[in-house]
Regions:
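A short, charged, amphipathic alpha-helix used as a generic interaction element across diverse proteins
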Residues: 109, 113-116
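Acidic phosphotransfer microenvironment of two-component signaling modules
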Residues: 85, 107-108
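Short beta-strand/loop segment at the start of cytosolic alpha/beta domains
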Residues: 1-18
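Amphipathic alpha-helical interaction surfaces in cytosolic regulatory modules
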Residues: 22-100
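Residues at the C-termini of beta-strands that transition into short coil/loop
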Residues: 20, 106
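Conserved catalytic submotifs in the C-terminal HATPase_c
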Residues: 11, 51, 107
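Short acidic-hydrophobic, aromatic-tinged amphipathic segments that line or gate anion-handling sites
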Residues: 101-105
Length: 116
């Protein structure tokens, strides 16, 4: 089962989204819906906490890429935090590690988005 949860953090001027489980084709549809809803609010800073993400397929990766591009067009920034070795390998294999700011912790990701 795949879930996307918004994490409340009053100390951060942005949004933290936690992805959990297996983001296969069905999960990619859930992710697409959540990201569409999130985009409507025009956030400027978004951290995706991937610690509990076990798998993400190409459709899910495509949703993150599209969200990132849309946010950047509007001056926003995206960072990934706590990315597992397997997910990081998939991003690197897809040559997406240059597109996303990847950080060891949520705190590091938040700090990186606050710069600039």
């Amino acid at each position: 089962m795949f879930q996307v949860r918004k994490v409340e953090d009053a100390s951060f001027d942005g949004v933290i989204m936690r992805l959990e489980g297996n983001c296969d084709l069905a999960g990619g549809g859930v992710l697409e819906q959540k990201l569409t809803f999130l985009s409507a609010g025009r956030p400027q800073r978004v951290v995706f906490d991937l610690e509990a993400l076990e798998f993400i397929g190409s459709f899910g990766i495509g949703q993150l890429v599209a969200f990132n591009k849309g946010l950047r067009i509007n001056g926003g920034k995206v960072a990934l935090a706590r990315v597992s070795e397997g997910i990081h390998h998939a991003l690197k294999f897809s040559r997406l590690t240059d597109m996303f700011s990847v950080h060891a912790t949520v705190e590091d990701a938040k700090a990186a988005l606050m710069v600039g």
